[in-house]
Amino acid sequence: MKRPIFIGITGGTGSGKSTIAKEIYRQFGEECIAMIEQDSYYKDQSHLSMDDRVKTNYDHPNAFDNNLLVSHLESLLNGHCIQKPSYDFSIHNRIEDTTKVEPKEIVIVEGILILEDPRIRELLDIKIYVDTDADVRIIRRMVRDINERGRTIESVINQYLNVVKPMHNQFTEPTKKFADIIIPEGGHNKVAIDIIVAKIKEVLGKYE
């Protein structure tokens, strides 16, 4: 198997990262793409009580097990399968279930802080930052957390103002300078997606 191409997609919470990833996935197909979500690599918190787990700052770099993520990316780069961890936000902890991920031509790494860690940056062939208005992002986050994670409106707003927004400004936004491509207007920018697809094909050609 030829060397896979690693694509990093980052941006603030609710920016449209997953939409971009899904569109790339749609255009190239599941035979060609492996998906790695940074959310799957939150640290195991089995040693903490539920009260302490609830206090976890999920938007801080220390929340992620980047050592495991880097190890898994290197394994995929070398043609080996990995067992991607699973995280259950309802219990604020990693669970025993894992997902087998096989090495593919294209590996998409998606998450709010993937460009914050230089070890991850060095593995990425194409680095994408999805830039979306803060008002749009908070609305999307509210919808997701209420519908998918059982949160209340009050808790989502409180978390956004006290954690998400300051962490975004401190850690996520500054990583924009590392991006090769910055996509305005989130995941619905068709022109930008077409450019990304063309760039992926170009890089794939270099590894043939």
Swiss-Prot record:
Catalytic reaction equation(s): uridine + ATP = UMP + ADP + H(+); cytidine + ATP = CMP + ADP + H(+)
EC number(s) given by UniProt: 2.7.1.48
Location relative to the cell: Cytoplasm
Annotated binding of ATP, by residue: G11, G12, T13, G14, S15, G16, K17, S18
GO molecular function per UniProt: ATP binding; cytidine kinase activity; uridine kinase activity
Alphabetical GO biological process terms: CTP salvage; UMP salvage
Organism superkingdom: Bacteria
Pfam family, one: PRK
Keywords for the protein's UniProt record, in alphabetical order: ATP-binding, Cytoplasm, Kinase, Nucleotide-binding, Transferase
GO cellular component: a single term: cytoplasm
Keyword hit for Transferase: yes
Pathway terms, separated by semicolons: Pyrimidine metabolism; CTP biosynthesis via salvage pathway; CTP from cytidine: step 1/3; Pyrimidine metabolism; UMP biosynthesis via salvage pathway; UMP from uridine: step 1/1
Primary residence: cytoplasm
InterPro entries xref list: P-loop_NTPase, PRK/URK, Uridine_kinase, Uridine_kinase-like
UniProt-listed PANTHER family: URIDINE KINASE
Family that this chain belongs to: Belongs to the uridine kinase family.
NCBIfam families: PRK05480.1, udk
Name of the molecule in the record: Uridine kinase
Naturally occurring in which organism (per UniProt): Clostridium perfringens (strain SM101 / Type A)
Protein's gene: udk
